[in-house]
Amino acid sequence: MIDEALFDAEEKMEKAVAVARDDLSTIRTGRANPGMFSRITIDYYGAATLITQLASINVPEARLVVIKPYEANQLRAIETAIRNSDLGVNPTNDGALIRVAVPQLTEERRRELVKQAKHKGEEAKVSVRNIRRKAMEELHRIRKEGEAGEDEVGRAEKDLDKTTHQYVTQIDELVKHKEGELLEV
């Protein structure tokens, strides 16, 4: 019962870190990155579909992304979706593919993005702590119902705290890495 609660908590914490990693990857760093477009969707025959499923995305140069739709009739829709996104880029359509030049970030914009990265990191840490809280409640329930002894639950709580600290540290490292990327000129 205790092992099950700890395993479940660790699995959920792992997912929270993965979500944080994905969220941070969508923040533009001033360098071309296919991940920038991972959350942009277009209306594809009535269904919201990710651009990554409708086109190949390549980075031939440090500040250039080339998007080649699998279907030529989707060029205009993809271009419009990118233009309307919050990426702050201006795509150009040459009839066969879309080129997106990634502009240099201003110092002000870098600071803004660092704040955004820290906020996303904080949200992820709150998520991990909530998972810990729920697991602690489960451990207290196990103790109360007599399914495990006081010592067993105490050890499990220490293990849970150690695991929580490990995942919070991972999130801090992800944010620190992203901050370094953003502030690098």
From Swiss-Prot:
Gene Ontology MF term list: ribosomal large subunit binding
Keyword Kinase belongs to the record: no
Record localization: Cytoplasm
GO BP terms in the entry: translational termination
Cellular component GO terms, alphabetical: cytoplasm
Keywords, ordered alphabetically: Cytoplasm, Protein biosynthesis
CDD domains referenced in this protein's UniProt entry, alphabetically: RRF
InterPro entries in the record: Ribosome_recyc_fac, Ribosome_recyc_fac_dom, RRF_sf
Primary location recorded for the protein, binned into one broad class: cytoplasm
HAMAP family membership: RRF
Family, similarity comment: Belongs to the RRF family.
Function field: Responsible for the release of ribosomes from messenger RNA at the termination of protein biosynthesis. May increase the efficiency of translation by recycling ribosomes from one round of translation to another.
Alphabetized PANTHER family for the sequence: MITOCHONDRIAL RIBOSOME RECYCLING FACTOR PSEUDO 1, RIBOSOME RECYCLING FACTOR
Protein's name according to its UniProt entry: Ribosome-recycling factor
Origin species: Mycobacterium bovis (strain BCG / Pasteur 1173P2)
